[in-house]
Every structure is written in C-alpha cells, then in structure tokens.
Amino acid sequence: MAGVQSAVALREQGFTGTVTLIGAEPHQPYDRPPLSKAVLLGKAEGSAFDIDFEALGIELRLGLDVTGVRPADHELDTEAGPVGYESLVLATGAEPIRLPGSDGVPGVHLLRTLDDAERLRPVLAERHDVVVVGAGWIGAEFATAARDAGCSVTVVEAADRPLAGALPAEVAAPMAAWYADAGAELRTHARVERVEPGAVFLDDGSRLPAGAVVVGIGARPATAWLAGSGIALGAHREVLADERLRTSASDVYAVGDCASFPSGRYGERLLVHHWDNAVQGPRTVAANIIGESPAVYDPVPYFWSEQFGRFVQYAGHHAPGDELIWRGDPTTPAWTVCWLRDGALTALLAVGRPRDLAQSRKLIESATLLDPTLTADPAIPLKRAVAG
C-alpha cells in the first residue's frame, strides 16, 4: 500500500523522473483490508488497485526480493542484481509474528497476504473447527469471517481481555461479550503450549480440536533486510524517520508500517500499523522528494475494524494519563469513548457512531478544548461540546 501510494503521489505532484516499484510478491499491487473480509469469504476474487501503472509511467518489478541497500553507493541489492537510485522510499510494511513451534505444522495459517487469504478460503468453505490465536484486531476480524461462514470458532488470548495491547481494560472489557454474542468462544488467560495437526494444546492441559489454526498475535516491521546498511532502527526494529519521513541515510525515506516518526501533536514517536498511515505518509514523502516546499508529517492517526456486526473506528492517540469519558452505554450497539488531555481531545473510539468519529478528527487537529459534561452526553453532537 505505502509503496504504491508513494509512486502514485510522485506522479500526482508532478515528478517527471523514473519511478520504479519493487515488490516481493508476484501479484499486481493490492489493498490489504479486504483480505480479512470480502476476499476471505469469496465475495471478491482479489483486491488489486485500479491503477494504470503503465499510463502513469511507473515500472513494476514484481516477485523480486530485495536483499540489502548500500546508501553510500545509492544502490539496492536484489536477487536480479543491483538497482541504482537517486531517491529511495522504504515501504516494506510489517510481517506477522509466527507462533513459536508452529512452523511446518499442517493447518496453521497467517493472514497477511493475498496468498494467505486464498489458502484460508477453502478452510471457511468446508466449515472446519477453527482456533484463532490472538484476540487483537486481525484475530477478531478473522473470527467474524469464520463465524459468518458457519465455522465453529475458539479464540485463544494470553491476556485477560481482547485488544489488551491497544485499549485500556475498561474499554476492551465490553468487547469480550461480542464474541459470545456471535457464537464464538473467547478464552482469555490462555497460552498455547503446542500445536499438532488437528489440535491446539493450552498450558492448562486442555485440548482444542482445530481443523485450522489462524495466528494473529501481532506484526513487526519488515526490516531484517536492512542489516548492515547503517540505516538507524528503533526499539521495535522499525526505521527511524524524522518529521519529513527521512531516514538517517541521505536520500532515503521510510513510510507506512515499517517506520516510526516523531509527532509534534503527541510529543512522542509513533509507530502506526494501520491503512490510513500508509495512505497519508506517501504524500509527504513525495513532496519532500520533489523538494519545492518541505512537508512535515504529523497526522491524526485513524483506523477502522469491522467485527461481529459492529463498525469500530479510532482516531488519534491516547496515553495512560489521559482523562477517559464515556459517551453512551457500552452494552448497547452504539457508544463512544473520548480521551482528553488538559481539556483537549486526543483520541476517540467510536462503535457504531461514525458522526462522532468524523467530528473528532477536526477537533483533535485543532486541539479544541471540550466540556467534559457535554462530551459525556451522547445526545449532544461532539462539535457542540466545545468548552465555553
């Protein structure tokens, strides 16, 4: 996504030089969100971008692995030989974390690529007993698709709640009920001890029948190939980009899931593994490569998830010390949570309340102060909750 958007943004902003897009996968560039939804359920054959790369003068080199980069020489090393560059954009994304001990075990799947989705489609069509490891965003979306297909689904989560790494306990706790409502079993405080063909064994001694096991325990930046390049990496092995998405190497930029950037708005470095970041960042990269007017990247992060019949949206970035305000009852189909810092909205999670989400992005961008009492009233439009 981020690589495609970078190439297109360069052309849209008037870049006339050569643009080459290199990808390890053999498929035409495609969008990832539909993989856990329409593609997985067979409602769509693929999710290729409707982009005429030839008309835009973008050369595609697909199915080509890049093995390294030598910034001093301005060259990439690939399986087909070196490729020179004047400017380089790193947009390698993230790769799923594998379940230890599961490599080579029949029936164990990841869900990150088009090939992954294609391998999982017959699993759903045959209505296997499915065990999902991890109750994060991807785990919940796959469990939703599996239940829609008529599969028996058990979700195993090591933490005490779903989305433990993304949301505080009081916000994530109501979401646990969504699993049972959809006919899926959620097992928390449960760790996988081992996986065998047809079964998952937990650390409490229980055995779960599993015609298929889908692992969704997180992702890490795909940057191992940068070893020895001298390009600075962060604590999560992500590329450290600056406010203009430049790396520590001259003429090398980084964007999307593989890179973190300093946010002036939030006062910390952000690593955002979501679709919107891969769409917005490339525009900044393109502007800085062209160089007519330097651009700073400081977005209001945004993502969405469709799970168990609910549309979940999140904007911004919250911290543990932010004030949490509820808008609505979390046992109902539609509710919102707001986070305030010094009276200003920093983040919002909306379940079935897209208007709250739309209004929140503008309020976050402008650092508008809100009245906590008005903010807590779901009958009052968020934009009307401004402090007097």
Task: Enumerate the language-model features and the residues they cover.
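Glycine-rich Rossmann-fold phosphate-binding loop(s) that bind the pyrophosphate
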Residues: 1-2, 24, 112, 133-138
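Beta1-alpha1 glycine-rich phosphate/pyrophosphate-binding loop at the start
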Residues: 1-59, 145-166, 359
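Flexible, glycine-rich terminal cap/loop adjacent to redox cofactors
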Residues: 12-16, 24, 38, 217, ...
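A Rossmann-like FAD-binding core segment of flavoenzymes
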Residues: 16-20, 60-78, 83, 149-241
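Glycine/serine-rich phosphate-binding loop and adjoining beta1-alpha1 elements at the start
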Residues: 62, 71-72, 79-119
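FAD-site-proximal beta/loop scaffold in flavoenzymes
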Residues: 104-128, 199-201, 207-284
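Rossmann-like NAD(P)H-binding beta-loop-alpha module
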Residues: 119-167
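Mid-to-C-terminal Rossmann-like scaffold of FAD/NAD(P)H-dependent oxidoreductases
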Residues: 258-356
